[in-house]
Amino acid sequence: SNNKFDIEETTVRLTEFIANDLQIPTIAHLPAVYLTKDMVSNILQSLDRVGVHQILALRGDIFPDVAPKDDFTYATDLIEYIKAEAPHFDIIGACYPEGHPDSPNQISDIQNLKKKVDVGCSSLVTQLFFDNERFYDFQDKCILAGIEVPIHAGIMPILNRNQALRLLKTCENIKLPRKFRAILDKYEHDPESLRAAGLAYAVDQIVDLVTQDVAGIHLYTMNNAATAYHIYKATHALFNHHPSVQSF
């Protein structure tokens, strides 16, 4: 949970409910800049107690009205601390196929990513992207840099034009390919068709990624269960035939 009010309690309660009550494999989400070392130690002990041993360790979004803590400036700092405190935990890190918005260039970004892996990340999940070729190029550059952990592709279906505009405003590093811009323009005043086209575009991305033996798919559903179910129905046969590809 990236809850900006009570990260410690919310994270543990939510992961315990999902893992033990719903019996669904669970990954806890920890934002580095809003945590202290004591908070992390307590969370690790609680997660250990409830049987959750996977963590997505991020820097965390910056909220202008919430003061960050002082112990962890970057995700790498948090990952290193978790590995020192609880080496049996499996840590997932974030990566950015089109470059981190705060990085001066992609070379610097991949160098920092290599540090993240070296201190303890066992796999990575990407920021969302809409051009698979950019992902493949990024993946090749990671291999050249010595990053050999699995990289899961982050996919977000765009269901309406306002969602796309908000995304472009908050994630300025993400580029929309011409094919996707054409969808937004053609169905600007036809919400039902835009939703259908956005879902189809996401499914096409996943089909291509699985065909190219991607390590896994991370679906950004924005808490929309109907969207998740639609994409599951359209793609689950692919995962049955490619059991090595993970989805979460």
Predicted regions and their residues:
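Conserved, mostly hydrophobic/aromatic
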Residues: 47, 116, 120, 153, ...
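Active-site pocket-lining/capping segments in soluble small-molecule metabolic enzymes
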Residues: 70-96, 144-204, 235-248
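Active-site glycine-rich loop that binds ribose-phosphate moieties when present
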Residues: 102-121
